[in-house]
């Protein structure tokens, strides 16, 4: 999927995260993470984000994550929502999101 414009998903409430995704003109995936639990779970959060982007075939994006202790399922859902908003997806391919 090609990121067409910046998009947000999520909140800054406890146990949630906010995802901002935008086109990366330099190419590739650039991930910026700010998390209250980065010391313990930063690597795992990055893995979930990168795996979700890969599953959605996103190759070029600047992704900024502000995490407040979100579970993996929340991270995955917020990243998926941000990608779909940034790509203006009208017909969702649900099998791609499992």
UniProtKB/Swiss-Prot annotation:
It is found in: Cytoplasm. The modification O-(phosphoribosyl dephospho-coenzyme A)serine is found at residue 14. This is Citrate lyase acyl carrier protein. Its main location: cytoplasm. Belongs to the CitD family. Keywords: Cytoplasm, Phosphoprotein. GO terms for cellular component: cytoplasm. Oligomer with a subunit composition of (alpha,beta,gamma)6. Covalent carrier of the coenzyme of citrate lyase. Signal peptide: none annotated. It comes from the Bacteria.
